[in-house]
Amino acid sequence: MDRSEIVARENPVITQRVTNLLRTNAPLLFMPIDIHEVRYGAYMLFMYGSLENGYKAEVRIENIPVFFDVQIESDNTNQLFLKSLLAAENITYERLETLTQRPVMGYREKEKEFAPYIRIFFKSLYERRKAITYLNNMGYNTAADDTTCYYRMVSRELKLPLTTWIQLQHYSYEPRGLVHRFSVTPEDLVSYQDDGPTDHSIVMAYDIETYSPVKGTVPDPNQANDVVFMICMRIFWIHSTEPLASTCITMAPCKKSPEWTTIVCSSEKNLLLSFAEQFSRWAPDICTGFNDSRYDWPFIVEKSMQHGILEEVFNKMSLFWPQKLDTILKCYYVKEKRVKISAEKSIISSFLHTPGCLPIDVRNMCMQLYPKAEKTSLKAFLENCGLDSKVDLPYHLMWKYYETRDSEKMADVAYYCIIDAQRCQDLLVRHNVIPDRREVGILSYTSLYDCIYYAGGHKVCNMLIAYAIHDEYGRIACSTIARGKREHGKYPGAFVIDPVKGLEQDKPTTGLDFASLYPSLIMAYNFSPEKFVASRDEANSLMAKGESLHYVSFHFNNRLVEGWFVRHNNVPDKMGLYPKVLIDLLNKRTALKQELKKLGEKKECIHESHPGFKELQFRHAMVDAKQKALKIFMNTFYGEAGNNLSPFFLLPLAGGVTSSGQYNLKLVYNFVINKGYGIKYGDTDSLYITCPDSLYTEVTDAYLNSQKTTKHYEQLCHEKVLLSMKAMSTLCAEVNEYLRQDNGTSYLRMAYEEVLFPVCFTGKKKYYGIAHVNTPNFNTKELFIRGIDIIKQGQTKLTKTIGTRIMEESMKLRRPEDHRPPLIEIVKTVLKDAVVNMKQWNFEDFIQTDAWRPDKDNKAVQIFMSRMHARREQLKKHGAAATSQFAEPEPGERFSYVIVEKQVQFDIQGHRTDTTRKGDKMEYVSEAKAKNLPIDILFYINNYVLGLCARFINENEEFQPPGNVSNKDEYAQRRAKSYLQKFVQSIHPKDKSVIKQGIVHRQCYKYVHQEIKKKIGIFADLYKEFFNNTTNPIESFIQSTQFMIHYFDEEQKVNHSMKKMVEQHAALAGNPAGNPAGNPAGNPAGNPAGNPAGNPAGNPAGNPAGNPAGNPAGNPAGNPASNALMRAIFTQLITEEKKIVQALYNKGDEIHDLLTYIINNINYKIATFQTKQMLTFELSSTHVELLLKLNKTWLILVGIRVAKKHLHALLGLHNNEPPSKTFIQQAIEEECGSIKPSCYDFIS
């Protein structure tokens, strides 16, 4: 079923009426959704949307004039001069027109108010842009000079909003397939002023399912074997969540369902073509998915490219004329569109923008609505809205069903996919996304695409120009090109009165706020660029003529900036552009809020089953969307005025607004103080005020004369709040009258919002209390909290719970006669309970969130992601089936984690070696839960809770800094946190055990080292040097001793080879008795026990060093053959040593297991405070055998190395007589003495 058939089925009556109107060429209503321009050749504008009944329509606007304006002052006002300028650059134009307009920058007196401009008309945008660039470079001021999107200028000039109903008149009509094509001129388009009928534009929500044969990975469109195997689509009316039709396109057999049409394709290529075909049949106005701009669209486009069908797919989906592949990729595939989520965050989107259909990513919309959301999944946003959740189907099961081609199970996959698409529309409707954006577009004369993909400042700028260029606002000529030097610096700061920190339990505090301070200042002081006077001489001249001026001055980048603005004195004709626009917006919003209130009251009186309820609900949503749009513009107005990239930017205006805010808050401050009121705190646009004590004298005396029960005290507090409310109402009226007298207008006003009692101020912009708005409300369930970190994004439930407990406990009403614990006592009590009673906390209390931003230097997150990458790679090496649990989130996406406890580790000398870095302790929530990893509660307390707790108590006298400290708050906060850290250390049992464990470790090390030194002499020093230079004993020990680990089977062969070489050497040297045959290495025959280990290598006992027995010192070698043999022996020793090293390396795993076993036992015995007993272990026979062989091999290697030294000495002395003992025996005896090291001694 195609779109026309669906429309006829759903709206038969309206369809018949629209058909009749088309036959008679009568005026029709058209709702634009998407805009496309033909920028080459003659300019044309195409608008795509729907007619009243839902028919798809294309409106082509022809004969649109292409022009811009240029201001030419002094004698060069004639057209001939401009013609000569254009001719010099070979710029072709159609005609010139002279007109007068008011320049937007700088005040002009009435007789000089208008300046001459020349409007230049062109045949194409190319020539227009060329002329704008040339004249700007020449220094001329231009206006109506949009260079990116000309349709915005068309909309402004014609006063024709692009997001609401338009009436088509005098059109030419041509039906072509599903699309009703109209051709009109600008004069044939009329803005429809009423709300219009129900919009029947069509939204297509879709979702894709992908597959990869590599389990545990996210399918990648660049991988040939990764495929999209299913696409599900569902269409709706734009305002409804009831589906009109549904389709499932799949590559696997799928059981049919009455809820959707199933299309089975034989290949991925056919699936993509079927998707394009179905898209063209429905011709949706809006296409939406969840995160589709970051996954679905890039996947579809990339796969279409691989199959060579992107051109065909695009042209099927597009309502425009066919395009070539290079044009599609250049103009219609938006690869990197930066979408602003909040002031600090943007996200990159990619999508295929086919003419006639506007793509909307629901995830982006929800992130803009919830910029501080910790989870940004579809499931999370559905939960936030109270909507039905998505279907739960794990990916590994989905892929299994696809692999098995089970049609029953594939129906489950299709249902999962269809429901995901359904939930996208549910979210769009619930949040009123399209109507809200449309209202913004109506005000700003921008398209729906602009309202979705561009930031607020862009729309405010366009709205200002739309107001400015029309007669009722003075025909102000505005440029869209920012000019002048762009300076970066800070405007005057706000006026701040430091808070009186601490808990206030005796007197109510009332907040007095300016209503919309910056817009109010703009309206009051006539801040507008065309009302600005730059020079003092001109200002004096104007004042001499009776004009009233507002002077502004402030310091910016080390210089004085000053200026004057001509005041309006409440005369409408004197009001500037900015105040006029703001007043108009304010009046509109006030009227809408009044209407909204009435509609809300009606909604409460009508049941949902009433026939008129839906219409009432729709009307309520529309009015609410309009007032929200007005609020957005008013709130972002100053932001654009202070944006130095804006064409409206004026430094004296931007700084003048903030300095005027500072002035007025000081004015109110002094007025209130002189009235006898106290100030608890003040900042930017608000003051927190306490009434004079005399106000409460009567009620206080009544309490003191009562029985002073709890009930009497509650009554006293109740009456104090009522008295404060009454006094503040009077004070507020007096303040507003005082402001009116000072600035001469009623635009700048203050209002009191709430009375806080009790209340606690902990720092600038940080306070909490019980709020009383209309009546006293001591039984409230929610505290009034501002700036306290428990509501900070990413914060754990642990921190929120502890912070809430402290605040709730401190807000309890306590009589002066009772014990009123100071805040520090409350904090310590709550903190002690949190630390000592650990069992009260659940796993969920420790879950945190953070954002993954690869370009930001968030060290903890960077370390964590590096660990996860290494873990994924390790799993892949071992052929693990899944690594998705360690997957890296998308840039900008938030992820959940916990801080887990790492085993306390010490080096062999008792120094802690376990990491304290946060990034090394972070684990994904799923991983920590699956492995039941212990939470590092102390880390949370020290790093997240204590800072919050310190904020409550840092006003205490003991934490205050000396007088020469500049940042007193920071100093006090640091001291308070240090105090609480010591408090936690005193009550946390684990900290004590860790300290004791380190002491025991150091004692054990000292004892072990002494024992080893007794037994192996020189080896103890080598052992000590090794462990002093390592932070990981097991791994480093293995690396340093890999040459000691195998070659046991070859031991006898090595000994035999060495003995044979020595015998040959002795025979040639004429000393056959030098090496008793059969003497095994490692057991020197005839060597008495206790032979000193200090005997120099190569010097037989009793022989002078360097002088072999029987050979005079320095006697040259008398036998060249013997000399050569010694070299051969030396070479053989090196060869044998290399063989041992290589062979022993292969036994690494066995020795690793052994060392791990021993080290773990050491740690266990240290943890249980066993000292000398730790030297005894119960080892298996395998371990014992390995230790014995390791011991022997060590000795062999030592022998070889010492033998090399002997040979080197012999060669150096040209001595051909060998020592009296074998080299190996001599080495062992000299290096180890008569006491051979035991197995455990050696390993330790």
Curated annotation (Swiss-Prot):
Changing A515V: In strain: Isolate PAAR-20; phosphonoacetate-resistant. GO terms for molecular function: DNA binding; DNA-directed DNA polymerase activity; nucleotide binding. DNA-directed DNA polymerase involved in viral DNA replication. InterPro entries: DNA-dir_DNA_pol_B, DNA-dir_DNA_pol_B_CS, DNA-dir_DNA_pol_B_exonuc, DNA-dir_DNA_pol_B_multi_dom, DNA/RNA_pol_sf, DNA_pol_B_thumb, DNA_pol_palm_dom_sf, DNA_pol_type-B. Sequence repeats lie at residues 1069-1072, 1073-1076, 1077-1080, 1081-1084, 1085-1088, 1089-1092, 1093-1096, 1097-1100, 1101-1104, 1105-1108, 1109-1112, 1113-1116, 1117-1120. Belongs to the DNA polymerase type-B family. Consistent with its intracellular location, ASFV encodes its own replicative DNA polymerase and three base excision repair enzymes: a class II AP endonuclease, the repair polymerase Pol X, and an ATP-dependent DNA ligase. Its EC number is 2.7.7.7. This is DNA polymerase beta. It holds the Pfam family DNA_pol_B_exo1. It comes from the Viruses. Gene3D superfamilies: DNA polymerase family B, C-terminal domain, Helix hairpin bin, Palm domain of DNA polymerase, Ribonuclease H-like superfamily/Ribonuclease H. Residues 1069-1120 are annotated as: 13 X 4 AA tandem repeats of A-G-N-P. One of its GO terms (biological process) is DNA-templated DNA replication.
